[in-house]
């Protein structure tokens, strides 16, 4: 894996708006194998949208990550943008 992405990290996924069907638009997410759609009355075909979510699974053998955004989306790790590394909470015992 080129950069280290771990469970709990906040990442961004980019999608391109496809065709419009009434108030919904289809989304094309690079390297995702499933179709997605959202309700967005202002999006036009060709627009690029950014979605942020947390990594819930990392498959190091196939270099893919699953992100909790639009449900769960599995994409190649090289197509996500790291927003924030996960930091464990620190507890102070008194």
Please annotate each region the language model reported.
Residues 2-4, 10, 14, 72, ...:
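Low-complexity, intrinsically disordered short peptide segments enriched in small/polar/basic residues
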Residues 3, 16-18, 89-94:
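OB-fold and OB-like single-stranded nucleic-acid-recognition modules
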Residues 6-14, 45-52:
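Short coil-to-beta-strand transition motifs
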Residues 14, 28-32, 68-70:
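Short strand-coil-strand connectors
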Residues 18-25, 58-64:
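Short, conserved beta-turn/loop elements at beta-strand boundaries and strand-helix junctions
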Residues 20-41:
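Short, structured interface segments
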Residues 35-94:
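Intrinsically disordered, low-complexity, charged/polar segments
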């Amino acid at each position: 894996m080129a950069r280290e992405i771990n469970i709990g990290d906040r990442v961004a996924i980019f999608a391109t708006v496809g065709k419009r069907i009434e108030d919904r638009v289809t989304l094309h997410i690079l390297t995702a194998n499933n179709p997605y759609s959202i309700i967005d009355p202002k999006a036009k075909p060709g627009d690029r949208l950014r979605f942020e979510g947390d990594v819930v699974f990392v498959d190091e053998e196939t270099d893919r990550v699953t992100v909790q955004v639009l449900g769960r989306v599995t994409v190649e790790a090289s197509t996500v943008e790291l927003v924030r590394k996960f930091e464990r909470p620190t507890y102070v015992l008194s």
